[in-house]
Amino acid sequence: MSLDLALDVQYATASDYLPSEEQFALWVKTAIGNSMEQAELTIRIVDSRESQMLNSTYRGKDKPTNVLSFPFEAPPEIELPLLGDLVICATVVENEAREQDKTLEAHWAHMVVHGCLHLLGYDHIEDEEAEEMESLETQLIESLGFTDPYKEQ
């Protein structure tokens, strides 16, 4: 089964390296896999200011963050393929990639996969949930040809 993906990528900031819409689509399709036949998703690439504002408003943390996930929740009687929105801060992703000695492409892929898994209902608050989510992330990232994102460099 192939995922029918409607992806809207919004580039709301400039940077030396931002993935293409094709890269984002590949990473989203890899993360979603066979869990849905159709999916609609928006990925918004933002600067630190917008990320900090959203993180403060929705998570009570007054600092920019790498990725925020906003799942769409329709009433039970309504079936829509709308998965939700990801907001990714380019500056934070770049800084983390440098600090973790990863390529930008690998870290962007990881953030997209991580965010999509949140949209699918995965979480990492409890240790057991975190282990399950990280294991799945690692499998997906490695299937894309990147190394384990949680392996110490």
From Swiss-Prot:
It comes from the Bacteria. It is found in: Cytoplasm. Binds 1 zinc ion. Single strand-specific metallo-endoribonuclease involved in late-stage 70S ribosome quality control and in maturation of the 3' terminus of the 16S rRNA. Belongs to the endoribonuclease YbeY family. PROSITE patterns: UPF0054 (PS01306). Keywords: Cytoplasm, Endonuclease, Hydrolase, Metal-binding, Nuclease, Ribosome biogenesis, rRNA processing, Zinc. It holds the Pfam family YbeY. Its EC number is 3.1.-.-. One of its GO terms (cellular component) is cytoplasm. The keyword Cytoplasm applies. InterPro entries: MetalPrtase_cat_dom_sf_prd, YbeY, YbeY_CS. Zn(2+) binds at residues 114, 118, 124. This is Endoribonuclease YbeY. GO terms for molecular function: metalloendopeptidase activity; RNA endonuclease activity; zinc ion binding. It comes from Shewanella sp. (strain MR-4). Its cofactor is Zn(2+). One of its GO terms (biological process) is rRNA processing.
